[in-house]
Amino acid sequence: MEELRQTKNFTKRDYRLSENKLFYNHSKFGNSNEIDIPFENIEGEKVSHKISNNNTLFFSVLVYIVAIALFISKINNGGDDQSVSLFWAVIATIILAFYWFNRDDFWKIKLTDNNYLYIHKNIPNKEIPENFINSLISKRNEYLKENYLIIDENLDYQSQLSNFKWLKSIGAISKIEFEEKYLELKATVNPRKTDIGFGK
């Protein structure tokens, strides 16, 4: 899967993969923001993240307390009309429903600038976002290997080794792949080779 579209509560999130980057468009109430994220900027760490407005939950509980207090007050005063307490109980229930409806369950993917990419876990269903994330990581790994897991005897040893370490740290290559490339690098490029001046 190369595209993912998610819509919830007037918010649209569109994700599209190219050969070397992820295009992300976020729009809400007609305001749109589109950015492109190079694969180099996607660290790939995926964690579960829930977003909810606890103030709304607190307000709902507060209104329930008011409804209960009014109900008890009417009983203590011998009143039979509970319409006021019922009204506030209905209001509290509506607020609680709003709270549950607006809770968001995301996959949070870390980016190199300490920002995160958020992808709904269950929109349009559970399987499609999972497949898209797998495609994203697979395409990222493929691109990074093609461009950074190469050995060139004319390039600096240390910078090439740093590339291999970076690829291993973000999970683009395995430890075994790293060790194989490391041995190949040492056999191809002299670690003590200097770029400036004269060697002794």
Which sequence ranges carry the predicted segments?
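Surface loops and adjacent helix of pleckstrin homology
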Residues: 27, 47-50, 98, 121
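Transmembrane-cytosolic junction motif
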Residues: 96-117
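Charged, low-complexity cytosol-facing tails and large interhelical loops of integral membrane proteins
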Residues: 121-200
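Short, non-transmembrane cytosolic segments of multipass membrane proteins
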Residues: 1-34
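Alpha-helical transmembrane spans
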Residues: 52-103
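Short, surface-exposed beta-strand-loop junctions and turns on beta-sheet-rich folds
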Residues: 29-32, 115-116, 126
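Phosphoinositide-dependent membrane-docking surfaces
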Residues: 22-24, 34-50
